[in-house]
Amino acid sequence: MREILLLGLALTLTGCMGLPKPDPNQAWVDLNVPADNALHAQQVDAQALDDHRYFEVQPGTHELTVRYQFTVAPDNIGPQATPLSRDCQLNIKYSNFNAGERYQLEAGSLGFTPWAKLYDQQRRLVGRAQPAGCQGA
């Protein structure tokens, strides 16, 4: 049991070590998603990203596009249904990104409907995403 805990800790630390150090001249956006779902940074201002684990943007106004993959539970579909995978894009525009600040983009779903919210460093809600299309995964 102890070996499993140590392995889990090592994997967690390895994953964190892979992220670059945030640039103090830019705003950093962390991605937060429930377990068993996936959230990926796709684009900033319609420009594709190389690294899908976070956003790093210049101060000012930007539109972020994320890809959110989640599973709709059977009780949200109907009797005797099986879980259904969804693959959605969402866009969120925010006009006041500040250099050196860290933001949190959280995603989730209500049944078939995905949502994402942007929070600033003080955990104030500063933006809500708009759906940009979904398909079955």
Predicted features by range, described:
Residues 1-18:
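Sec-dependent bacterial lipoprotein signal peptides
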Residues 16-137:
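Short loop/turn and low-complexity linker motifs enriched in small/turn-promoting residues
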